[in-house]
From Swiss-Prot:
GO molecular function, one term: GTP binding
Region (G4 motif): 254-257
CDD domains: EHD
The entry's keywords: Glycoprotein, Membrane, Phosphoprotein, Sarcoplasmic reticulum, Signal
Protein name listed in UniProt: Sarcalumenin
Residue intervals of the Dynamin-type G domain: 89-330
Species of provenance: Mus musculus
């Protein structure tokens, strides 16, 4: 018994001495200079934040008066599953962090915001530590917001997340932090991808939630650890979801100072070899190679290269912040183009149905024939003949089988019937927004003009603005 007691005391002393050595080592570990972060992101400037409220109010008015009526009338949200809220229009740029588990996503956010060793820092560790979707926003003081509260707040852009169920809302957390960078951008940390875990075990539709954030992100950081490149089925699914968003994707090879130069080159090549089948674009996404954490780079590594890569990433982030309004207006205009094309297609389906119907026809069979083979009735070719319709913007034909499967054709009116004496025609209003109102609003930002005032420089007040997008 005495020997056992002595053994326990000996082990305890070893643990305490080991812990003391770790603490001493962490205290002695030099921290790198952070001045380049504040300088590149212009966080040291005392100038007041730009007031974009007038532009955003004008943008919101254009959306509600010129785009949303046609969108609701032809149930566009049931085709694309992307409902635009006022909170999304007025929201700050969103930066999304994706990648396998324990690659340094949370550590990178802590580093960019300088949250290490503060009560604000995100929990990090070698094991999978993030099981929630964590949204970091600006606030006057540190505050944690439950997911169910975020979804219920219509002023925020997260109310549509309610459709993913209560199990997901329990895995959604908002954190308000009084940080200058968060006045201009919102960070979203995500659970790491674990290849040996089935999606069903999460208790909510993980891929669908990721798609929701991907569709709304202005910048997407896909983070990898060079010491464990594991490209499996879940990561393959993630890159499928990123199709069409290649311009927003930035791949980060984190913890690069853990490898020697030759090994780092091999890992860089192996990463592209693994991702090549998943990224089918001519120009690959930008890859940043660095180490995003507060400790200094390890000796005998390419610290100058890593620092330049980090500054390039910060410049990329700052560019997204600076172009916030331009990106928002371009996004709403692209949304309006898709809504217009959808309305034209539904109108064409309906017109074809009316043309083919006779007194003795079975309406259900007639419309089923049209939906099953729209090319037989020149549905899509007719729409391509319209002004300002690109074949690259046309939705998938298969999507309309599902759309009309839950929305009977009898629920819709022809576009020619969507007019009123006071309100005008829905189609004319959305076309005016696409060709005149939104380009004019975009031009007013660069010229520093009041977006509410008419622009008379080119057309002269009282004259009809020329359609710059119409072919002559």
């Amino acid at each position: 018994m005495k020997a056992l007691l002595l053994l326990c005391c000996f082990l305890a002393s070893l643990l305490l001495s080991g812990q003391a050595e770790v603490e001493d080592a962490s205290e002695e570990a030099p921290l790198r200079d952070r001045s380049h972060i504040d300088k590149t992101l212009m966080l040291n400037e005392d100038k007041p934040a730009d007031d974009y409220s007038a532009v955003l109010q004008r943008l919101r008015k254009i959306y509600h008066t010129s785009i949303k009526p046609l969108e609701q009338s032809y149930k566009y949200n049931e085709l694309r599953q992307h409902e635009i809220t006022d909170g999304e229009i007025t929201s700050k740029p969103m930066v999304l962090f994706l990648g396998p588990w324990s690659v340094g996503k949370s550590t990178m956010i802590n580093y960019l915001l300088g949250l290490e060793d503060t009560r604000y820092q995100l929990y990090t560790g070698a094991e999978p530590t993030t099981s929630e979707f964590t949204v970091l926003m600006h606030g006057p003081k540190l505050k944690t917001i439950e997911g169910i509260v975020m979804a219920a707040d219509s002023a925020r852009s997260f109310s549509p997340l309610e459709k993913f169920g209560q199990n997901f809302l329990e895995k959604l957390i908002g954190i308000e932090v009084p940080h200058k960078l968060l006045e201009r951008v919102t960070f979203v940390d995500t659970p790491g991808i674990i290849e040996n875990r089935k999606q069903q075990e999460r208790g909510y539709p993980f891929n669908d939630v990721c798609q929701w954030f991907i569709d709304r992100a202005d910048l997407i950081f896909v983070v990898f650890d060079p010491t464990k490149l594991d490209v499996g089925l879940e990561l393959e699914m993630l890159f499928r979801q990123l199709k069409g968003r290649e311009s927003q994707i930035r791949i980060i090879l984190n913890k690069a100072d853990n490898l020697a130069t030759q090994m780092l080159m091999r890992v860089y090549g192996a990463l592209f070899w693994s991702l090549a089948p998943l990224i089918n674009v001519t120009e690959p996404p930008r890859v940043y190679v660095s180490s995003f954490w507060p400790q200094d780079y390890k000796p005998d590594t390419h610290r100058e290269l890593f620092l330049k890569e980090e500054i390039s990433l910060l410049e990329d982030l700052n560019q997204v912040i600076e172009n916030r309004l331009e990106n928002k207006i371009a996004f709403i205009r692209q949304h309006a183009i898709r809504v217009r094309i959808h309305a034209l297609l539904v109108d064409r389906y309906l017109q074809t149905y009316k043309d083919k119907m006779t007194f003795f026809s079975d309406g259900e069979l007639v419309f089923k024939d049209i939906v099953e083979d729209p090319d037989k009735f020149y549905i899509f070719k007719t729409i391509l003949a319209k002004t300002n319709v690109s074949k690259f913007d046309l939705p998938n034909r298969e999507a309309y089988k599902d759309f009309f499967g839950i929305n009977p054709i009898s629920n819709f009116k022809l576009l020619s019937q969507q007019c009123s004496y006071m309100g005008g025609c829905f189609l004319e209003k959305i076309e005016r927004a696409i060709t005149q109102e939104l380009p004019s609003l975009l031009g007013s930002i660069g010229l520093g003009k009041n977006p509410g005032a008419p622009n008379c420089d080119k057309t002269g007040c009282g004259e009809t603005p020329k359609n710059r997008y119409k072919k002559h």
